[in-house]
Amino acid sequence: TPLHSSAASDVYKRQQSSRDTARNLHLYEIETSFFKFLSPRCKARVPACYFDEFDPKTGDGILILEDMLPAKQIPQMNGCSKIEVSMVLKEAAALHKSYWNDEHLLSYPWLTYSVSEERKKFVTDLLPVAYPEWKKRYQGRISEDIFEMGDILFSNYSEYSNVEEGPMTLIHGDLRLDNLLFTDENKRAILLDWQTAAVGLPLNDVAYFISTSFANPNDREKEEERLVAQYHKLLDVNDTYSFDEAWSDYRRASFVGFIMAVLSAMIVERTDRGDEMFAVMAERSAWQALHLDALSFIT
């Protein structure tokens, strides 16, 4: 095996509470398995993996990945430009096309945790406890319009989450600026942090990324239909998946960022930066969902 002059390692050893959550959600197993089994045929830009190991007994693992310096990260709360959004959507299209309707994905148990009865029960049991506490935490910080939207969404969550139609592919599951790097070389974005990779609906990644990446909701409103059309063209499966279908799935998926922000805020270790970041993510995604009338899918 050749030695590499530059590499970056990720060793999964954090505070016990964080490790317990990660173990319960299979996060470390998912990421190491992605690099072992699926990254070699991923057309999106991801770091090369030189070594991976996961111990299911302890939940510890190691990844040694390609060093991506001098690539840069854009802070989540800052948001990014429409050009940078386009760069990421190009990679999202490449990712989704690589595994489009590939039923072999279902043979990997670690890739189906997010759609398993175990995960559905986890979320269904957590939401009635987490959402009221989330509202209490952000009272006075988050708009009442957003709270009202959340009340309706989570009262109808079983209906919202019960989606049985649509294209299937490998999705990143947490496609946002904190999990990306940008490089001037070939003007490409690099996708990192695959702990939430899953079999899922492709527009979940797209809506989540667009909603959380524009600091100004007016900019998002002006650009998002064009950006989704660009993604759909790059996906190049028009014969089986029309733009109208993609746009409808995008509108429905606009809740994804809000749900992720609420749950993440309540299960990860709390910090001042984390509190504000999850508030910003929830706001951006909620304004997107309200603008796109996503509640019409469940009411």
Where are these regions (language model features)?
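ATP-dependent phospho-/nucleotidyl transfer catalytic cores
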Residues: 72-172, 184, 273, 277-299
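Conserved catalytic motifs of the protein kinase core domain
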Residues: 7-8, 60-61, 166-168, 187-188
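Helix-rich C-terminal or lid/interface subdomains of diverse kinases
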Residues: 86, 233-299
